[in-house]
């Protein structure tokens, strides 16, 4: 989905189109029935997942009041009745397990969020995280190794977009984004 389709607001983050496409692919939602989107922002990941997989139940968690309003407006705009919005900050108490968890950031609670996400995944469930900070990348990778996550994969996405400049065009660079994906396997993720 094009980024321009989503309602946006100042200081409300959105997972961009190319990053979203890669993250959704790595979540392997074709075999999922429940996705948790932590720090849903505008809802771009939740909405694209819900539209691609209409039988998927999506739980979108967001703490920012401005983002919650945009998330709800975008959910209504795209008529996504399969998205439940949970106001609040993860880690939080929620019932049930998921087949996939997406984290678009950590809010300063990275290892606690990873543990929380793994605890809410069914065996075989997928966790996908995106970061722009190198420190978060290294901390996440080290913690995932420590807890025994399986099928770990990491990609750095560096995109540039063709942009007008005077009478010509140039490729305007975007910041690199790190995408980490892993899986919870039964008897492979140790209790902390």
From Swiss-Prot:
Single biological process term from Gene Ontology: cobalamin biosynthetic process
EC id: 2.1.1.196
Catalyzed reaction equations: Co-precorrin-6B + S-adenosyl-L-methionine = Co-precorrin-7 + S-adenosyl-L-homocysteine + CO2
Matching SUPFAM superfamilies: S-adenosyl-L-methionine-dependent methyltransferases
UniProt keywords, alphabetically: Cobalamin biosynthesis, Methyltransferase, S-adenosyl-L-methionine, Transferase
Keyword Ligase tagged: no
Keyword Metal-binding (UniProt): no
Pathway(s): Cofactor biosynthesis; adenosylcobalamin biosynthesis; cob(II)yrinate a,c-diamide from sirohydrochlorin (anaerobic route): step 8/10
Molecular function terms from GO: cobalt-precorrin-6B C5-methyltransferase activity; protein methyltransferase activity
EC top class, as a word: transferase
Residues annotated as binding S-adenosyl-L-methionine: 15, 39-43, 62, 90
CDD domains according to UniProt: AdoMet_MTases
Family (UniProt): Belongs to the methyltransferase superfamily. Bacterial-type CbiT family.
NCBIfam families: CbiT (TIGR02469), PRK08287.1 (NF006138)
Name recorded for this polypeptide: Cobalt-precorrin-6B C(15)-methyltransferase (decarboxylating)
């Amino acid at each position: 989905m094009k980024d321009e389709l989503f309602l946006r607001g100042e200081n409300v983050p959105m997972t961009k189109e190319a990053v979203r496409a890669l993250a959704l692919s790595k979540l392997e939602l074709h075999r999922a029935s429940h996705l948790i989107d932590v720090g849903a922002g505008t809802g771009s990941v939740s909405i694209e997942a819900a539209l691609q997989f209409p039988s998927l139940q999506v739980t979108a968690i967001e703490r920012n009041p401005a983002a919650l309003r945009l998330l709800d407006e975008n959910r209504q705009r795209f008529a996504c009745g399969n998205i439940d919005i949970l106001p609040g900050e993860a880690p939080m108490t929620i019932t049930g397990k998921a087949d996939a968890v997406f984290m678009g950031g950590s809010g300063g609670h990275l290892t606690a969020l990873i543990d929380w996400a793994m605890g809410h995944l069914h065996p075989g469930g997928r966790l996908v995280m995106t970061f722009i900070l190198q420190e978060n990348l290294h901390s996440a990778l080290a913690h995932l190794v420590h807890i025994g996550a399986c099928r770990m994969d990491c990609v750095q996405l560096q995109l540039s977009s063709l942009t007008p400049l005077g009478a010509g065009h140039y490729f305007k660079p975007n910041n690199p984004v790190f995408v980490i994906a892993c899986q919870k396997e039964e008897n492979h993720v140790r209790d902390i």
